[in-house]
Amino acid sequence: MVRKTALGLCGMVLLAGGPALPAAFAQSSAGADVQTLDLPPSGFFTSLVLAQGYKESKDAFQTDRYKPVNPGITFKSDSEAIYLVFDILPRESPAHILGQLFLAKDAGRAEDRLLSEESVYLQTSQDSGFIEFLRPKEGWAPGEYKVKIHIGEKITDASQLGTLRFRIIASK
């Protein structure tokens, strides 16, 4: 009898929306989510790197595989493009992976500046891919850049998986 009453009370509390969370806890949870999105994504990707290029090969199932060429986090301003090269976990549905390239805020810029949005659509048989970020028309300005990585058909606050950062230095 006591057990049924306790279960009934727990069920009523849950149906009523549960106990209210303290405001401090709710704020710290929201801050943790923002901090997590500013880190490299984990879980969905088995490999994820920025590189100066990529090399294509076939695996045992004759599926295209992409391997990074000259991976790093620092690139020269005369680079034609920066590539986001990745492998993802097997899945039951196709994946639409999007990347937003930003020139990161600094002393001269109050906000990140969006430079481009690129995407790739992977069928269920594809576990490897890349996104190419071409040199902007005005060239790569030396400084910090970031790539926000999303999954889905369009970019929303909920679609972001994480962020990668890199630096452009002046060519000699």
Please place each PLM-identified region on the residue numbering.
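Contiguous segments within soluble domain cores/interaction surfaces
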Residues: 28-137, 141-142, 148-152, 156-165
